Structure formats: structure tokens, C-alpha cells
Amino acid sequence: MKTKLASLLVVLFISTTTQLSAQRFTVQPVNDDISYYLDLKAVASIFGDSRNLEDFERRLNNDDDQISNLDLNKDGEIDYLRVIETYEKNLHLIVIQAILDRDVYQDVATIV
């Protein structure tokens, strides 16, 4: 029984799920390569600490915190991450997108 409980706790920790005052959310990378260059645990943490989505976006792109090393367009610069709020069926989603060029974006993670 203790082994099952410990395994469950490890799985919950690794999946970057966090509990926030009775609210639960999960940060899901678009693919495994993204999670190598984007600290999903830090993303979940600052999402929980942010006052609103604007504050969350500002914190994601703060040079001092170094949450992201994404350079998806290979221009030698770390890509700016924008935060989009959307609804899909009955789900409220927060989508994190890398800005690659003018009017060119790539989804990198979703917060469910």
C-alpha cells in the first residue's frame, strides 16, 4: 500500500500537476522536445503565483528567471512566449505560444 501511494505521489509530481487553493491544473507540453527547453515545473509554479494572465506572461519572459530556452525559429534569440486564454468545448484552457515571426506563432504548452 505504501509503495502504491509513493508511486502515485511521484507520478503526480513528475506530471507537473499542482494544487492551488482547491483549483487543480496541469501543464502539458506540445511535444517532448519542448519540455527540454521549457521548465514545466517553473511554469506551473509561476502560473499559480501570478495575479492574472498578463502577470503570468511577464513572469514567463523574465530574463532573471530563465524559465524558457526556446529558440524554435533558430534565430539565436530566445523566443518570446505569449499567453492566450481560450475555451474548447467545456474546458477553459491557457495556451502558451512562442512568437516566431510577425503573425507566426507555435503552441508550446497548454494549461488545463
Give residue spans per PLM region.
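Bacterial Sec-dependent N-terminal signal peptides
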Residues: M1-F25
